[in-house]
Each structure stands twice: as C-alpha cells, then as structure tokens.
C-alpha cells in the first residue's frame, strides 16, 4: 500500500491515489455494517456516514496533491497506532504518520492520511483527511 501511495503521490496520480482508498461500495458493504455508526445510539444512515468520510477525504486528497504531488518524497517510514481499532472483521489503524526526507530538504513527519483499514489481509486508505 505504501509503495503504491508514494509512487502515486510522486507522480501526482490522482486516479492512482483514489484507487488506494476505500470505495463507496466497500464502505457500504464491508465497513459500515460493522461500524459503531450503524448501531444505537448513532444509527446513522449509510449515505450520511459515507458523505462525511468522502468529504473530508476528498478535501485532504486535494490538499495533499497541492502540497506534495509531483515531487520526490524520499519516503522513510510509516507509523500508525500501536493497536488497531477492531470493528468486526475490520481493523482500523489510526494516527498514521509518514516520515519522509525530500532531496535537498529536511526530514519531516506528517499525517498525510488519517487511517488505514485492514480486512482479511488487504489494506486500503480509509480517509485522506490530513494535517494540511
């Protein structure tokens, strides 16, 4: 996932970055039914929950591409929370930060996306909401 993320960001490949993120169908059928948002006391409609995720993710993706897209990143490491949040079959890794050192620049550690979802050994970016 990170290799693909870095490559897509360095090439400013919007479609490549979108493909790494959870889709509306994956959210509706795989994530939402096992999310606390689907049960009381929240009992949100799936469309409302998706709208909230997709809005913040879309804004974050645009900011990410504007700030870092098309430039060598100099990826060093990824760090997420020590333990994932478990929601049924889904494991959500939060507080993810990326350490990178662009050529000629100083090392930085930033939140380039909010979280990663893992399900049955497969990983996707849950949201591109970020520190920008």
Residue spans for each PLM region:
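Short, surface-exposed beta-strand/loop "edge" segments at domain boundaries and coil↔beta transitions
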Residues: 104-109, 132
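Sparse recognition of residues in long alpha-helices and their boundaries
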Residues: 33-34, 132
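Hydrophobic/aromatic beta-strand elements that line small-molecule binding cavities or substrate pockets
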Residues: 111-117
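A sequence-level detector of short linear motifs
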Residues: 109-111, 125
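Short, low-complexity N-terminal intrinsically disordered segments enriched in polar/charged residues
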Residues: 1-15, 19-20, 26-31, 37
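Surface-exposed, charged secondary-structure patches
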Residues: 35-106
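Short, low-complexity, Pro/Ser/Thr/Gly-rich segments in the mature regions of secreted, periplasmic
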Residues: 117-132
């Amino acid at each position: 996932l990170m290799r693909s993320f870095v490559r897509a960001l360095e090439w400013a490949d919007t479609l490549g970055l979108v493909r790494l993120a959870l889709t509306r169908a994956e959210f509706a059928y795989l994530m939402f039914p096992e999310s606390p948002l689907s049960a009381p006391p929240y009992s949100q409609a799936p469309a409302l929950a998706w709208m909230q995720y997709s809005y913040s993710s879309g804004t974050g993706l645009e900011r990410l591409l504007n700030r870092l897209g098309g430039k060598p990143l100099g990826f060093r490491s990824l760090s997420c929370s020590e333990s994932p949040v478990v929601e049924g079959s889904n494991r959500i890794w939060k507080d993810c930060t990326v350490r990178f050192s662009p050529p000629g620049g100083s090392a930085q550690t930033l939140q380039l996306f909010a979280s990663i979802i893992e399900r049955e050994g497969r990983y996707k970016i849950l949201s591109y909401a970020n520190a920008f």
